[in-house]
């Protein structure tokens, strides 16, 4: 039987991604009003254990995956960078083979995407990318779920990304051809998306429009998306903020988007840097629904990976 890893969006078929989102919507509706610790009907992952490895600190990823396993009737074990580091002391491949003997699936939040790929190649259980320097596929599934939940039809929609063409942007680029939306990306030249990701989208016949101003990218967009300008470990933070400041999402920028446009941000947010408080705390913002939907999207991802 083929092992179902969830490392990136682009290798999956559109039908598989659609099925994951449909199940996420259905599971969320099925437990509306329930206590958060109540197990889903049928306990789909009863007896299953997820190992969670964190090389990077986390709030939403850690809590959402742990609660996902609890609600599905399973359990989780967490190891941080203080407990272990991939490739140090023991090879990534050996770690993957050992953990495969103990647990049913592994979620990794890592510094280097290549480590996650090497881990998955050696593992005999499903491996999920919880975030790497290259991509953040679980986040994008939650984002798309949130947009659908608020009435947006993805096919034919125009989404705009402004700021740093980072790992989250990369996963939106991968998702565009799979779900049929176009993506306008507004970044400074030095923070433009990786050419490899643009080539992936081109091969999948996705529409990705690149701009050097936020205003051009946002014009007429149904959704405006931002992310932090400075992440953990970034050097020369002051210079980054200076270069990216013209890409901050303000009320004035949102006025250039389509009527009723929504705002997304995967959090944590820095009000006054990449987004103004009036936007992220205003009526267009879906950020807390987006954060909650990490739980529901990841439950569906776990069930898809484990064939449950």
From Swiss-Prot:
TM stretches of this protein: none
Family: Belongs to the aspartate/ornithine carbamoyltransferase superfamily. OTCase family.
Organism the protein comes from: Hyphomonas neptunium (strain ATCC 15444)
Superkingdom, taxonomy of origin: Bacteria
Main function: Reversibly catalyzes the transfer of the carbamoyl group from carbamoyl phosphate (CP) to the N(epsilon) atom of ornithine (ORN) to produce L-citrulline.
Keyword Cell cycle (UniProt): no
Key word Signal present: no
EC number in record: 2.1.3.3
A Pfam family: OTCace_N
Protein name in UniProt: Ornithine carbamoyltransferase
Disulfide bonds: none
Entry binding sites for L-ornithine: 167, 227, 231-232
Enzyme class at the top of the EC tree: transferase
GO annotation, biological process: arginine biosynthetic process via ornithine; citrulline biosynthetic process; L-arginine biosynthetic process
């Amino acid at each position: 039987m083929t092992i179902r890893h969830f490392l990136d969006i682009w290798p999956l078929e559109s039908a598989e991604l659609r099925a994951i989102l449909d199940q996420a919507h259905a599971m969320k509706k099925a437990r509306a009003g329930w206590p958060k610790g109540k197990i889903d009907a049928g306990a789909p992952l009863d007896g299953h254990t997820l190992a969670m490895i964190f090389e990077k600190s986390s709030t939403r990823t850690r809590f959402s995956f742990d609660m996902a396993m609890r609600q599905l009737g399973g359990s989780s074990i967490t190891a941080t960078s203080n407990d272990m580091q991939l490739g140090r002391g023991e090879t990534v491949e050996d770690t993957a083979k050992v953990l495969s003997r103990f647990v049913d699936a592994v979620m990794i939040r890592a510094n280097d995407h290549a480590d996650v790929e090497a881990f998955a190649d050696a593992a005999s259980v499903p491996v999920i990318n919880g975030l790497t320097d290259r991509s953040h596929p679980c986040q994008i599934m939650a984002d798309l779920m949130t947009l659908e939940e608020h009435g947006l039809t993805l096919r034919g929609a125009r989404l705009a990304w402004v700021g740093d063409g980072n790992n989250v942007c990369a996963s939106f680029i991968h998702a565009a051809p799979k779900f049929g939306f176009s993506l306008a990306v507004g970044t400074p030249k030095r923070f433009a998306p990786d050419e490899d990701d643009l080539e992936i989208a081109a091969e999948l016949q996705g529409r990705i429009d690149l701009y050097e101003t936020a205003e051009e990218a946002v014009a007429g967009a149904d959704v405006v998306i931002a992310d932090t300008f400075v992440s953990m470990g970034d050097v020369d933070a002051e210079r980054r903020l200076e270069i990216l400041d013209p890409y901050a999402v303000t009320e004035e920028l949102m006025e250039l988007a389509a009527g009723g446009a929504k705002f997304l941000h995967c959090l944590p947010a820095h009000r006054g840097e990449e987004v103004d408080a009036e936007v992220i705390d205003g009526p267009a913002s879906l950020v807390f629904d987006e954060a909650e939907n990490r739980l529901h999207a990841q439950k569906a991802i776990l069930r898809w990976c484990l064939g449950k």
